[in-house]
Amino acid sequence: MADVRFLLTGDTSVCVEFGNEISEAINAKIRAYNIALQDSKIPGIVETVPTYRSLMIHYDPEVILCAPLMEELRGLLGKLDQIRIPPSEVIEIPVLYGGEEMGPDLAFVAEHAGKTQEEVIQIHTSTEYLIYMLGFTPGFTYLGGMDEAIATPR
């Protein structure tokens, strides 16, 4: 995998970067690599944090030094084709749309998209979204799959 980069991000972490775009293909590589890493049981791994295009690996340098860790991490790349990624779980989340208190953005999204509010709701609820990563606020998800017909600037 020529496009994979290993970036030292401090004295206790390494970032394995799989590309420079947000895509389901890169997400699948990150998930497979994370599973391979967990299965390898490399001593000293403290935590892994998947992102849109990379996997941050936190490690304990008193258990494993950087050079041997990097060798182990590079070795995992050849195993990704053998990893079975578990199927995604669909979680349905109830949503309340509209009104000043519950959904003040609905009118803006509809106007921006040139749609009725009902059309925006239909488009929004007829799509399955992929969770790429969890954010800094507990439970906050970064999703992919927004229909371009209702995509709006932040």
Predicted regions and their residues:
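Conserved "landmark" site that anchors the functional core of diverse proteins
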Residues: 1-154
